[in-house]
């Protein structure tokens, strides 16, 4: 009986859909609220949301690069370079998806958006890695390691975690 109640509480996770968003309320971003929607949309960067009915329950923002950044400044530069290189490669931008922020409005949404994004990247023809640019917090470490990522590198102000894309 108790197990059924717990399972029913997360039943909504079966109905969610990963969608691309044009903008988000950046003040809700607990990791990088200083990054405006312009930043999140320029140079091939993307915002993805997990939609449950009419509600966005989780958000994850990405840049696409060819190297792993150690800071937001490097992320900015590397995604600009990958964007410019994409002009010569029929629009194929970067081989690494860098998740630089994630948040959830509903319990279980953060883990579910990681799962859905992982599946999307796995299906991609050109993306070979899923790496984070995470803050140096216990919460970020617990979240990513619990979801299967391994610590890749500790930087001056950030940590990179990598999700294994192997079969």
Q: What are the language-model segments listed below?
A:
Residues 103-104, 131-142, 155-160:
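Conserved beta-strand-loop-alpha-helix junction that forms the acyl-donor binding cleft
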Residues 145-155:
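Conserved acetyl-CoA-binding loop of GNAT-fold acetyltransferases
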Residues 49, 55-65, 98:
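Conserved beta-strand in the GNAT
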């Amino acid at each position: 009986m108790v197990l059924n109640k717990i399972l029913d509480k997360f039943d909504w996770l079966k109905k969610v859909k990963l969608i691309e968003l044009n903008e988000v309320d950046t003040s809700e971003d607990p990791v990088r609220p200083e990054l405006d929607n312009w930043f999140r949309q320029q140079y091939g960067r993307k915002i993805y949301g997990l939609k449950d009915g009419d509600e966005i329950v989780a958000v994850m923002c990405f840049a696409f690069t060819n190297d792993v950044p150690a800071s937001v400044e490097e992320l900015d530069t590397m995604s600009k370079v990958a964007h410019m290189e994409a002009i010569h490669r029929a629009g194929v931008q970067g081989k690494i998806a860098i998740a630089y922020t994630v948040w959830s409005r509903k319990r279980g949404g953060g883990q579910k958006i990681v799962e859905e994004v992982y599946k999307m990247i796995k299906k991609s023809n050109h993306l070979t890695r899923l790496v984070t640019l995470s803050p140096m917090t216990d919460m970020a470490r617990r979240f990513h390691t619990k979801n299967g990522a391994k610590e890749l590198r500790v930087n001056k102000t950030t940590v990179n975690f990598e999700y294994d894309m192997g079969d």
